[in-house]
Amino acid sequence: MSDFTHFNEQGRAKMVDVGEKPISQRIAVAAGRVLVSEKTFGLIQSGGMKKGDVLTVAQIAGVMGAKRTPDIIPMCHPILMDGINLELSLDEERRSVEIKATVSCDGRTGVEMEALTAVSTAALTVYDMCKAVQKDMVITDIRLLSKTGGVHGDYFREEN
């Protein structure tokens, strides 16, 4: 079990001690999408959803989600984030809401989980705001696009 950083000698879960790691700038970018019907797409685009401006509310929810990441991911460290930016856009060809989150900090641990949680929360908010019109929306392709900083080096996803 000693090869696994999130388990102690007894095989029980533990939070990794990052106290000895050097502080470095960390940036993570994540993305995802919500596939919607033509009707739902039109209502989002025109601002006609009864619950309000879907993209603005989802953007705010994504920021809130990033800030709450250690509350819902058990072994995630609470960290002081320097910035959280969500970009939501409509893709007519895919008929989707495209979501991208960028999270940054100067710290001892990365912000990948915060970026992924921001995207997930924004996507769930899109679903919540549109579910009265459409129940079969699909939340999909939530993924880490890149991460920089830290001892494990940089990562950049190759998109097809």
Say what each PLM segment does.
Residues M1-L55, I60-H77, G83-N160:
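C-terminal binding/interaction regions
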